[in-house]
Design a protein with these regions (language model features):
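Short active-site loop at a secondary-structure junction
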Residues: 1-57, 90-103, 174-177
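Short, surface-exposed loop or secondary-structure junction motifs
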Residues: 46-185
Length: 185
């Protein structure tokens, strides 16, 4: 139905980048100021990248980091992921190529949290869902499965049998992939 909730996955990134754009418009952030100038504890594996990395680099997927998706799925919280960033070896030189990266988008959400003192989830709800009338959208798999109508995932096994599977919970990686919505919203 038009109200059936489903994970919009990486389309969540557009919501995160919109929150960042709002913070830039409010003068709280600048696309081209190195992250380390806002947060002295910001550290990447590469010293040059640490000194030069900006929101524009992060939003454009040009940090040189490989996706490291298992890291944001298995990490306890975003602040722990922030600390672990310094140990991730780059896959390419900084700004040399575009490497799609959920981990970096998760950290972009953490930057918004650190700047505002609000959770990313609350920022999305208050600044986007509420003003846009998105009453059937949320930021958590746990919330989605409580909804009266949500898409149930299935998987076809190697044996050809289709089976119901659990909803994948990627709440930690929310800024990259955890928004659930519906056609109506």
């Amino acid at each position: 139905t038009p109200k059936t909730q489903y994970g919009i996955a990486s389309c969540s990134k557009s919501f995160t980048s919109t929150i960042i754009a709002m913070l830039v418009d409010e003068g709280k952030l600048d696309y081209d100021v190195p992250i380390i100038e806002y947060f002295p504890d910001f550290k990447m594996y590469d010293e040059f990248a640490t000194k030069e990395c900006t929101l524009r680099d992060m939003l454009s997927h040009r940090t040189g980091l490989a996706p490291h998706d298992a890291l944001w799925i298995d990490t306890i919280d975003r602040s722990t992921l922030w600390e672990r960033l310094r140990y991730l070896k780059p896959m390419a030189p900084f700004r040399a190529q575009t490497l799609y990266n959920n981990t970096i988008y998760t950290l972009i959400g953490h930057i918004a949290e650190k700047i505002t003192g609000q959770t990313w989830d609350d920022l999305i709800k208050e600044r986007l869902f509420k003003p846009l009338g998105m009453t059937n959208s949320n930021t958590s798999a746990d919330d989605m499965v409580k909804a009266p109508d949500y898409a149930i995932p299935y998987w076809e096994g190697k044996d050809g049998i289709v089976r119901k599977v659990d909803v994948l919970n990627v709440d930690l990686g929310g800024p990259a992939a955890s928004i659930n919505s519906c056609v109506e919203d």
